[in-house]
Amino acid sequence: MKQILFPFEIDNPIYKEAYVYAVKFARNLNTQMILLNTFIITAGNDITKDKYSKLIRNKWFKAYNEVSKLNKYYLEEHARTDNQLIIKFDYRFINGTLKEEIKNVAREDAVGLIVLPVSDRKEMNKRQLEIIHDNLFEKNRVSLLVIPFKGVFKPINNIVFLTDLKKLHHFTQYLNNVIQCAEAFDSNIHFVNISSKESDVNQENSEVYQEIMKITNKNPRYVYERLIGNNVIESVNQYVENNNADLLVAIKHQHYFLETLFHKSITDEISLNSKVPVLIMREIED
């Protein structure tokens, strides 16, 4: 897998569990993590080079100190049950805005996954949604792992993969990606088709359905379910709860999340209100 990007802020507790998830994914998928912290230094025309360098060093020191606290939390709470696979860290402490630097790093580096926590602050969640919606990530096919507010890491034993069975570009690659994730975490997969009514999709005529059937026939830990319900959020949350899901996975369509039934507002609501982490993969543009 490509590198994992973990943007973080200073003295914000929502990043602790998000950091744990980022490290777990980096360890299990055997990839490097980029730790990104941004800051703004306002300097007048009369500032000297030495003073500016001192301001930069002070910001770097604070960022390194924050990383130390995140590592301490991880080691105290989670390292006992982890394998000791060493992962590499790439530190990026940059004078700039977080949103723009996330885009710059994703554009310039081989980033495959960005880990973002949900906050109880509306302005922060608004920024997170702007990141989720940005077309840069569609062009670069960067996936997003959204960690729920007050979420606590749990082993990923059950993955729920949402699908409307509509054929997307290169859909087999997404199926392979979720299988790769399941193998890395030794997880079960529930391929779940949620429809607003019984006649929405003719399963047998769907290439996606046929491909999923091939997958489930090869592995008894991978199953397919079909749910009928007008309230998408309620149906998803109920299924997640009933089946002890630890990760929710879905494809963001080029235009809308799972095109019609899973439209943009549903994307936002699932991302911000899910009780389990949501992995959003992007449809590849032709």
Identify the function of each model-found stretch.
Residues 1-54, 160-225, 245, 273, ...:
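Small/aliphatic-rich secondary-structure junction motif
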Residues 23, 134, 179, 237, ...:
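Active-site phosphate/pyrophosphate- and oxyanion-stabilizing loops and adjacent acidic/basic residues
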Residues 34-36, 90-94, 145, 190-192, ...:
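General small-molecule cofactor/ligand-binding pocket signal
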Residues 53-69:
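A short acidic, glycine-rich active-site loop
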Residues 78-90, 217-223:
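A short helix-to-beta-strand connector/capping loop
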Residues 88-101, 232-233:
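Charged docking surfaces used in two-component/phosphorelay signaling
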Residues 101-152, 242-243, 247-286:
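Gly/Ser-rich helix-loop-strand patches that form or flank binding pockets
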Residues 210-213, 229-242:
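A short, acidic, amphipathic alpha-helical segment used as a generic capping/interface helix at domain edges
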